[in-house]
Amino acid sequence: MSKIHVRKKDTVVVISGKDKGKIGEVLSVLPKKGKVIVKDVNVVTKHQKPNRENMQGGIIHKEAPIFSSKVMLYCDKCKSATRISNKILEDGTKVRVCKKCGETF
């Protein structure tokens, strides 16, 4: 269980698997499992039984978690997947920086 390099609301690109090349926003991070849930990536169909919240039931589509090692942060300036480095500014704040172009996240 290592530290996850992406955070909630980051834009990421999938680098391997059936959804390779898809770009999406991180909906949630599961650090104990080492997984992330990305919008419109790894969508599975679930057969839901009727219950109090969902009286109708039926087939629903929802995103399933994928391993965090399969995603990379997406830089809007570079328009590509990139690695990040941490940089400390003069005022002492810590920011994440794109290794390709130097853009801050």
UniProtKB/Swiss-Prot annotation:
InterPro entries the record matches: KOW, Rib_uL2_dom2, Ribosomal_uL24, Ribosomal_uL24_KOW, Translation_prot_SH3-like_sf
Pfam family for this entry, one: ribosomal_L24
GO terms under cellular component: ribonucleoprotein complex; ribosome
Family label: Belongs to the universal ribosomal protein uL24 family.
Function: One of two assembly initiator proteins, it binds directly to the 5'-end of the 23S rRNA, where it nucleates assembly of the 50S subunit. One of the proteins that surrounds the polypeptide exit tunnel on the outside of the subunit.
Oligomeric and partner information: Part of the 50S ribosomal subunit.
Name this polypeptide is given: Large ribosomal subunit protein uL24
Species assigned in the record: Clostridium botulinum (strain Langeland / NCTC 10281 / Type F)
Gene (UniProt): rplX
